[in-house]
Amino acid sequence: TNCGPRFTIIEDIPYDRPNTTMRSFTMCPECLAEYDNPLDRRFHAQPNACSKCGPRLELLDAKGNHVETSDVIATASQLLKEGKIIAIKGLGGFLLACDATNARVVKLLRQRKRRPFKPLAIMVADIDETKRHCHVSETEEKLLTSPQSPIVLMRWKPDSKVCQAVAPNLKYLGVMLPYTPLHHLLLKESSLPLVMTSGNISEEPICQDNDEAIRRLSGSADYFLVHN
């Protein structure tokens, strides 16, 4: 628990649910049955939860107001397709996301983030999508699909739809695969390669919680995809 998902929710030791931010979510009967069953793969999984008893997603506008929608993922994906910038709460902090094929919005993100030249990384749905944009060696594929989910620099294909504004004047593109369920859902629903860059203004610390993100990123993001 020195790093990774557990580190982002633990507040004290030992690593038990009452010592994590999951303590405020009471398990429903189905989740509790899984948790108590030694034969279940979720036996004593401290963050065990489901859509009925676990954390909830919420979409907010740039001022932090709730956006009414029956499907948060579908609405957020549509906004990305429309060229909006969304601050997404991930593991340990926020990311700023936009359509990596849209030069206008990528340039706007650079302007708002005050990062005019440094290359940006993208996230794509899977290894097949990666190969549409980059030449991928066997070693690079192993790195991409490893549990660490690193950003891997790979040679950019000339016919890639990822716009040049992502990494101006460079032959290599930084690519990562989804490493949380939320990322997987967004990438699947949007069918886009997405710029994923740290949720901060250049040289500032990354935003960690909802209130801080709304306060510091309201001039950078058009919407916020958060959870409780």
Where are these regions (language model features)?
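Active-site-adjacent structural elements in enzyme catalytic cores
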Residues: 1-228
